Regions:
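Short beta-strand/loop motif that positions the catalytic acidic residue
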Residues: 346, 352-354
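Hydrolase active-site cap/lid region
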Residues: 281-329, 348
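Catalytic active-site module of serine/aspartate enzymes centered on a nucleophile-bearing elbow/loop
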Residues: 395-436
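Cap/lid segment of the alpha/beta-hydrolase catalytic domain
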Residues: 189, 193-259
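N-terminal export signals
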Residues: 5-24
Length: 436
C-alpha cells in the first residue's frame, strides 16, 4: 500500500462508504492485474473462446466493421480463424495492423490516396485494439500506442475532413482526445458538438467512422475523449478516478469555449457501456452540456455484475485501467464506482438505452439511476436484449444509435420532451409510460 494515497471523504459525504483508495497517477503497477476468477477460470475462458470466437463477451468484430467498413471482412474472418484462446488476441491484431500498414505504404507509393487513407485508419484501429488484452505496462503496450498514434496521424493527413489531436488539461498533466469537424465546414460557422466517451474496450480513434459517420453527416463536430483510466491515459499513468471525470468535464467545456467553431448553446455528450457511467460523471457539474445519451448501461453499484458475474476479463481490464494489480486493493477501490453522489446534479436532458437482459448491468440498477437524475429523462428498454443492444427488439424497433443522434438533435433545438419509459418489444412495438 506504500504507493497509494487516501481520498478525502468530502466528495462522497452524502453516501456512507468505507475509506477509499486510488492509484497514484504516474506510478505503474509492477505486475499485471491478478484476479482469483481469471486465474482459476483461464482454462474455461480459453475453451469458451475456442467455441464462440473473439466475440465471446462483446461484439468486437461488429464494432470494428462499423468503424472501418466492410472492406475488413476478410480480416475479421482471418481473425476468427486465428483466435482460439485469450493469449491469441494481441498478436492477431498486431499482425493485422502490420499488414494494413504495409498496404497503406504501398498505396502511397502508387499515388493512391484513398486506399492509403483507409488502410492507415484501419491499421491504427488494429494497433489500438491490440492494446485490449495487454494489461502489462511495458514496451509492447507503449509500442502499440506509439504505432496507433503514428498511423492515425498519417490518416489525418489524408482524411476528407479536419481532424486534430487534442490534449485536455488534467491535474498538471493531460488526457488525450481527437477533434473532428464535419466535411465542408466553412470558417466562421458555428457547429453543435458531441463529446464522446467510449466503453472500457473502446478508444477515441474509432469513435468516428472512416466513412459515413452519422454525427459528421448531421453537421456535428465531435470530440472523442479518453479520460482518466481510458485506453491511452493509463499508458501515461493516469488511472480511473470518478472525481477526475467530473473535473475533466469542466476542462472539456473550457476547451470547447475557446474553439471558434463551437456553438456553446449546443453541446451534448454520449457514452457507451462503461462510458454511460463516466459520461454522466463528466457532465454532472458542467452546465455547458445540454443533453446526454448513452447505450449499454453500467450503473450497477461497485460494478457487481460486470466484475463478479461476467467474463473475468472485465475485472482484470478495469484493474489495469485503475492502476491496481492487487485484487484485495481493488475490492476497496471499486466502491468509488457509485453514481449516487452525482446523478441528482445532472440537469441536462438524459437518454438511456439499455437491454432488458443486460448481462453486465441489471435493469434494476439502470432504473435506479434514471430515478435519481435531476433533469428531463427518457429510458428505452429493449426486450430480451443483452448489453450490446441487438436482437429482434433493436432490429425492429428504433435503432439505438440512430435514435440517439436524432434525440440529441431535437434536444439541442429546444424541442420539448416528456419523462418517459419506453419498452421496445421484439416486434418493434413501443409501449410508453410516464416516469417521475
Amino acid at each position: 500500500m506504500h504507493r497509494r494515497h487516501f481520498l478525502r471523504a468530502a466528495p462522497l459525504a452524502a453516501i456512507a462508504a468505507p475509506t477509499l483508495v486510488h492509484a497514484k497517477d504516474g506510478v505503474f503497477p509492477a505486475t499485471e492485474p491478478h484476479t482469483k476468477r481469471f486465474d482459476e477460470q483461464r482454462w474455461a475462458l480459453d475453451n469458451i473462446i475456442q467455441a464462440n470466437g473473439i466475440d465471446w463477451d462483446q461484439g468486437h468484430v461488429s464494432v470494428l466493421l462499423r468503424a472501418c467498413g466492410l472492406d475488413i471482412q476478410n480480416d475479421m474472418a482471418a481473425l476468427r480463424a486465428r483466435v482460439k484462446k485469450y493469449a491469441d488476441i494481441v498478436p492477431a491484431f498486431e499482425a493485422l495492423a502490420r499488414k494494413r500498414e504495409a498496404m497503406a505504404i504501398e498505396a502511397e507509393k502508387n499515388d493512391e490516396p484513398i486506399p492509403a487513407r483507409d488502410n492507415y485508419y484501419t491499421a491504427a484501429a488494429y494497433w489500438a485494439t491490440s492494446m485490449w488484452g495487454n494489461e502489462v505496462h511495458g514496451e509492447r503496450l507503449r509500442h502499440a500506442n506509439d504505432k496507433k498514434r503514428e498511423l492515425f496521424t498519417k490518416y489525418i493527413g489524408l482524411a476528407d475532413h479536419h481532424i486534430e489531436w487534442v490534449e485536455i488539461p488534467y491535474r498538471g498533466k493531460s488526457v488525450p482526445a481527437v477533434f473532428h469537424l464535419p466535411p465542408n465546414h466553412q470558417a466562421g460557422g458555428k457547429l453543435p458538438v458531441v463529446v464522446m466517451v467510449p466503453g472500457m474496450d473502446g478508444f477515441k480513434e474509432r469513435s468516428v467512422s472512416l466513412n459515413g459517420d452519422g454525427w459528421l453527416e448531421r453537421g456535428y463536430a465531435v470530440l472523442a475523449i479518453e479520460g482518466p483510466g481510458y485506453w491511452e491515459s493509463p499508458v501515461r499513468g493516469i488511472f480511473i478516478d470518478v472525481q477526475g471525470w467530473v473535473e475533466t468535464g469542466k476542462e472539456v467545456a473550457k476547451w470547447l469555449r475557446a474553439r471558434p467553431e463551437i456553438d456553446m448553446d449546443k453541446v451534448a455528450a454520449t457514452g457507451s457501456s462503461f462510458g454511460s457511467f463516466f459520461a454522466a460523471a463528466m457532465i454532472s457539474e458542467e452546465p455547458a452540456f445540454k443533453a446526454c445519451a448513452v447505450t449499454g448501461t453500467c450503473y450497477d453499484l461497485a460494478g457487481h455484475r460486470i466484475f463478479d458475474e461476467a467474463s473475468p476479463t472485465f475485472k482484470k481490464r478495469f484493474m489495469f485501467m485503475s492502476g491496481i494489480a492487487d485484487e484485495a486493493e481493488f475490492e476497496t477501490f471499486r466502491q468509488t464506482i457509485d453514481w449516487r453522489p452525482f446523478a441528482g446534479k445532472i440537469k441536462a436532458a438524459f437518454l438511456i438505452a439499455g437491454g432488458e437482459s443486460d448481462e453486465l448491468c441489471p435493469l434494476e440498477a439502470t432504473e435506479a439511476f434514471v430515478k435519481a437524475l435531476g433533469g428531463p429523462k427518457q429510458l428505452m428498454v429493449y426486450q430480451d436484449s443483452r448489453h450490446s443492444l441487438s436482437g429482434p427488439s433493436a432490429a425492429n424497433g428504433p435503432e439505438p444509435r440512430i435514435y440517439q443522434a436524432e434525440w440529441i438533435t431535437r434536444r439541442l433545438k429546444g424541442a420539448p420532451m416528456q419523462n418517459e419509459r419506453w419498452f421496445v418489444e421484439a416486434s418493434g412495438k413501443v409501449d410508453k409510460t410516464a416516469i417521475a
